[in-house]
Amino acid sequence: MGKRIEDLSLLVVDDNAINLMLMEDILEMMNVGEVKTVDSGIGAIDEIQKNPNYDMIVMDICMPGMDGYEASKKIRHLGYTGRIVALTANVLTTDDSQFKEAMMDDVLLKPVDLNMIKKVLCFE
């Protein structure tokens, strides 16, 4: 990608308001250029339709209504080519076929770890 962290534009999707605030605070501490948050898969789809230029989407998996897998698939079908990173508390997920089927690029485990976020943002 070649962008500096300060130039990145991220969309964070989580149905839990505390998790959204935590991610937003961490990303702002890291000097991420733009951080937008939405609280549902449908909200993410609406946001991508309005602004398809986000560099990355951090997508919670377990959400009511439309889970992160389904939202990611729909976003990809809209033509979004940026990175989609799954956000999950399920540490027992060893089968990554669901992530691949949803066309997700990486996985972050909750609770989020600053070093893992840096790795994902810098694509290490």
Residue positions per predicted region:
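Two-component/phosphorelay signaling modules centered on CheY-like receiver
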Residues: 17-36
